C-alpha cells in the first residue's frame, strides 16, 4: 500500500492538518449515515398511473390516461406518410422521366449511410437510381446449316447446293499503305525543358 496515501475510515471527519480553506458548503466530514433507501421515488398514490388493476376487468392501457378519451379516428391505416419512408418495390419505377419499356429502372430509395458523408440528412438519390439497359439476348442459331432448307436432310439439299450458281469472284481491293517515318532520332525531345 502507498504509505503516503492512507485513507481514513468512513464516518471519521477529515482532519484538516494543513489548514486548507474549502469553499462554502463543502462538507468537512462524512455524513453520519446515508438516508434509507426508498423504492418509491415519489411517495404517495398517483391517481394517473395505478400500480395495479382491478381483477376482472380486461387488462388494457388507455390511450390517454388523463381523460380516458379515445384518439380521433384516422381513415389512413398507416400513420406515417408514404413519402417519408421510401420502400424498394418489386416492380419497375413508374416515373414520367423514365423511358418505359426501354430501360429497367430501380425505385427511388434513400442513399445508404456510407454514401452520405458527414451529413445527418437522408438524401435521396434524385433520379430513379441506376438505369439498366434492357438485356439483349445473344443471337442463337436455328440449327439449320447455311444453304439448307428447313425441314430437309443433307441428301435432299446437297444436289441443289452443288449445282447452284456461284457468283463471280470479286477482284481484290487495292490497299494503299501509308509511308512511315524512317527510324532514327525523333525531331522532338521526350524530355521536357528544365526551367
UniProtKB/Swiss-Prot annotation:
Membrane topology annotation: Multi-pass membrane protein
Membrane-traversing stretches: 19-42, 143-164
Translocase among keywords: no
Keywords: Acetylation, Cell membrane, Cell projection, Cytoplasm, Glycoprotein, Membrane, Phosphoprotein, Transmembrane, Transmembrane helix
Residues with the Phosphoserine modification: 6
Subcellular location: Cytoplasm, Perinuclear region; Cell membrane; Cell projection, Axon
Residues modified to N-acetylmethionine: 1
Residue ranges that the UniProt entry lists as topological domain Cytoplasmic: 1-18, 165-195
Main location: cytoplasm
Posttranslational mods: N-glycosylated.
Transmembrane listed as a keyword: yes
Tissue occurrence: Expressed in the brain, within neuronal axonal fibers and associated with myelin sheets (at protein level). Expression tends to be lower in the brain of Alzheimer disease patients compared to healthy individuals (at protein level).
Family: Belongs to the FAM168 family.
Task performed by this protein: Inhibitor of neuronal axonal outgrowth. Acts as a negative regulator of CDC42 and STAT3 and a positive regulator of STMN2. Positive regulator of CDC27.
Name of the protein: Myelin-associated neurite-outgrowth inhibitor
